[in-house]
Amino acid sequence: MDEIATLRRRIDELDLALVTLLNERARCALAIGHEKELAGVPVYQPAREDDVLANVRRANRGPLDDAAITRLFERVIDEARRLERQAAARRPGDGAAAGTVESA
């Protein structure tokens, strides 16, 4: 039982580190979203999303398979995109970049 408790504590530590990193990533995404809005660029950038997913799959050494890594990062990217849209909607201006129709 001591080993289980030790491993669970380690998971708790890793979870806290993940939360910190995810929030740091979200702050970067928000800053990028602001720059996109200033440049009149749409929130959704499919080529960039493809690059991000390819990068994390290349970095993956398991035990999670590439499909699992892809699903996790697709969710992270979706949340970043949602934050970008929310932030753009709160800023004064026409919000043209935030309202751009997305295409896959």
Describe the residue ranges of each PLM region.
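Domain-level signature for soluble enzymes in the chorismate/prephenate branch of the shikimate pathway
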Residues: 1-104
